[in-house]
Design a protein with these regions (language model features):
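Residue-level signal for well-ordered alpha-helical positions
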Residues: 17-18, 51, 87, 126-127
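Extended, non-globular alpha-helical segments
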Residues: 67-70
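Acidic, PIN/NYN-like endoribonuclease modules and their adjacent C-terminal/linker elements
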Residues: 1-3, 28-30, 102, 106-134
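Short, well-structured N-terminal submotif of metal-dependent ribonuclease cores
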Residues: 1-40, 52-63, 132-134
């Protein structure tokens, strides 16, 4: 079983059916095995739900909630925040949300971290995959 941590951009592109990216993400998801798990954190949920809440778009909010109900939410513990703190100290360019995402994926032994952010690959190249590079 593989555990795949989804960056917020991947969830947003997929749920909102981004013209350039949604079909590629859907194909990647369809190629996963039955026992593979798509994972997210409470921080991903926060990042995805801000705009629908801000704009009072209940339809989009419901789409996100439906998506999250079918995936695996990973807890964010004090140990994860400590690991994120160390990552921030080690990598000057790393922002706090990205440090938390990486720390969460590492802590929970995720096999891959799907993103569209090339900067993260230099920090954890064996984990981070820019799945939207064409």
């Amino acid at each position: 079983m593989s555990k795949i941590y989804l960056d917020a951009c991947i969830v947003i592109y997929f749920v909102e059916k981004h013209l350039a990216y949604a079909s590629k993400i859907e194909a990647l998801i369809n190629n996963l095995g039955m026992n593979d798990a798509l994972c997210f954190s409470p921080l991903i949920r926060l990042e995805c739900l801000v705009m629908p809440l801000r704009t009072n778009d209940t339809t989009l909010q419901n789409l996100y909630e439906s998506f999250f109900k079918t995936q695996k939410m990973l807890e964010m513990t004090v140990e994860i925040f400590d690991k994120a703190t160390q990552l921030r100290a080690d990598f000057n360019s790393l922002k706090t949300p990205d440090a938390l995402h990486l720390a969460t994926a590492l802590h929970h032994n995720c096999d891959e971290f799907w993103t569209n952010d090339n900067r993260l690959n230099s920090i954890a190249p064996s984990l981070v995959k820019n799945v939207l590079i064409t």
